[in-house]
């Protein structure tokens, strides 16, 4: 069995001033459904880690907890965070980086449960490409062999000041390079794979299954920036805003119980999880099976979030540490 890992959380962008049209409705979430279940509206971004929330639906875990969970795809994590903070969504998917960016801007959110991440022994793997579903990839005939060689080069990302940029910048700094000398450009993943194959960019920051597509086209992985940055623990999170944490604490606790159960099931039943991941991402099953597989943590630990907070400040992506504490984690005692 493949070593399990998380699914990408790298679709985030750096700001919150984004359209919320993708959230599907401007009305506030409804409290209950016709069958007496409490309804929670949840924003996702259509990535492989969504398999766990789909498992919680299909296995009846949410229903067992008295919940009717309605999911909709938002444009990106910051848009989801803004929708959750305003009450348009009850919960939303977001990695720890956009969460910390939001907190630094005074947006109050809480982490309710883990959505994806790394196992505690992930860094001990002999091949980090089996652990990390993000990758920095150069073209087939590129002379570049190290992230250190990318000064003055052009690297594509799905968004600026977001997870892939942060993790690649961190890897470059550790290698003795200067991330400020990189020419970052924004390309969606499909365009990035094509541009890399055509030699129009020097490297691309990608996420599975696009990493596999780039390698199939002759690309070469020179860095696994995600695992090197996060090391272990939850990366993607299910977040709730002030309104939901105040108005629906019991429902959020129920959601956490159900999703933790689904996360544990997904880790033990990878075939089912991969099948759902293929459907969620509209990707051929064989491509998903040949990509690194998601790891779904069953807890959110403050220590893991603090490492990210400190790193963002050290890299200059935050003016200073947010100085988070246990109150960030919903239900923490």
Where are the predicted features?
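C-terminal motif of bacterial Sec signal peptides marking the signal peptidase cleavage site
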Residues: 18-22
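Short, glycine-/small- and polar/acidic-enriched structural segments
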Residues: 33-170, 174
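A local structural motif
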Residues: 36-40, 63-74, 88-90, 173-187, ...
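Short, solvent-exposed loop/beta-turn-alpha elements that line the ligand-binding surface or hinge
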Residues: 64, 119-129, 227-230, 296-303, ...
